[in-house]
Amino acid sequence: MTLRIAITPGEPAGIGPDLLLKLAQQTWDAQLVAIADANMLKQRAKHLGLSIKLIEFDQHAAATPAPAGSLYLHQVDVAEPVELGVLNDANGQYVLDTLRIASEKNMDGTFAAVVTGPVHKGIINKAGISFSGHTEYFAQQSNTADVVMMLATQGLRVALVTTHIPLAYVSRAITEDRLIKVASILNHDLQTKFGIEKPRILVCGLNPHAGEDGHLGREEIDTIIPTLEILNNQGMNLIGPLPADTLFQDKYLNEADAVLAMYHDQGLPVLKYKGFGNSVNITLGLPFIRTSVDHGTALDLAGKGTADVGSFELAIREAIKLAQEKAQNQ
């Protein structure tokens, strides 16, 4: 059975369309369907010197992979013509429309997964649309109360307790309820999506030296340690809280299936240093599979043909792999 994978290229003025067009030059063992504007893709392909044949997507037809140099397309119109590297808030709604369609078509079973290209949160908000990120948007669209953002590269998976919030708000956001929900989703999806029977998860402390017995902060003593005890008593295998400045060593990571970091810039700098351009963003807890790139829109590289396809390619391959495993287990 050929699986259908939805792809949203992201911000039209950035490198997302470039990367998708490059990757469409090869064959895939799934039907890749771009949810995007045809004219925008054709103009970008011409600018890059790439040949592309766009095939109108018919969800009622049998799913077949596109030949190299071709791409199935679900049309969504941009509001205004796209200028390379120049943000235009008039096209903010276009970006959200591509995400909404991807979400709806994954929810109704048309697609087996969605792969998202990089978006520019600022320009979407400038258009008057509240948007904090893909993870939160897909959770809202699918009526999912709690989701977890996890990035993965070779030998390292990092999930986050908090995501796109100011650093000043992190401490108050780390509650027993939040920790239980995030750790439970992470543990469950490592078992069901990645086939890890009993995941071993390393948990970062919030404060320097994991609080150093309360001398550098009490969040570990008051919240994190008691919550980990509750979860471990339920059968999970959570180790911590551990000092984040020493946790990310091979001698610890080689024995772990994932790291649970308290906030965005605690866990992700290490992962991106280890595998930037070769890592993938995976949203856990959603009723459908969603993967994404590990980088931004790179407006300065749009249309130049020099942007690295590594992370986008990995995101597509990971989505196909997870979708195949899900199909086999159903």
From Swiss-Prot:
InterPro entries: PdxA (IPR037510), PdxA_fam (IPR005255). Pathway: Cofactor biosynthesis; pyridoxine 5'-phosphate biosynthesis; pyridoxine 5'-phosphate from D-erythrose 4-phosphate: step 4/5. It is found in: Cytoplasm. Its EC number is 1.1.1.262. A divalent metal cation binds at residues 164, 209, 264. One of its GO terms (cellular component) is cytoplasm. GO terms for biological process: pyridoxal phosphate biosynthetic process; pyridoxine biosynthetic process. GO terms for molecular function: 4-hydroxythreonine-4-phosphate dehydrogenase activity; cobalt ion binding; magnesium ion binding; NAD binding; zinc ion binding. Keywords: Cobalt, Cytoplasm, Magnesium, Metal-binding, NAD, NADP, Oxidoreductase, Pyridoxine biosynthesis, Zinc. Its cofactor is Zn(2+); Mg(2+); Co(2+). It comes from the Bacteria. The active site is located at the dimer interface. Homodimer. This is 4-hydroxythreonine-4-phosphate dehydrogenase. The gene is pdxA.
